[in-house]
């Protein structure tokens, strides 16, 4: 849950049962893993479908991907 707390206000990707992937800004969550996303969009291959503000029921969540931060390697 700490990772979710650190991701509040940031973009995440949520994979749901049935293979659906949704990307959006994490606005909130609860202990049951119910998730509130703003600016959400469903990812369908190279296409996206705008969903806006949504609530995802926790028992449908398979995976939550935190924001990926690129850190270049230092050359020594």
What residue ranges belong to the model's regions?
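Conserved RNA-binding domains used in RNP assembly and mRNA/RNA metabolism
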Residues: 1-76
């Amino acid at each position: 849950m700490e990772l979710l707390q650190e991701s509040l206000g940031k973009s995440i990707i949520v994979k749901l049962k049935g293979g659906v992937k949704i990307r959006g800004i994490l606005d909130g969550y609860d202990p049951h893993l119910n998730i509130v996303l703003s600016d959400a969009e469903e990812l369908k291959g190279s296409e996206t479908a705008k969903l806006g503000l949504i609530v995802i029921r926790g028992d449908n969540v398979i995976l939550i991907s935190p924001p990926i931060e690129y850190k270049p390697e230092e050359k020594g």
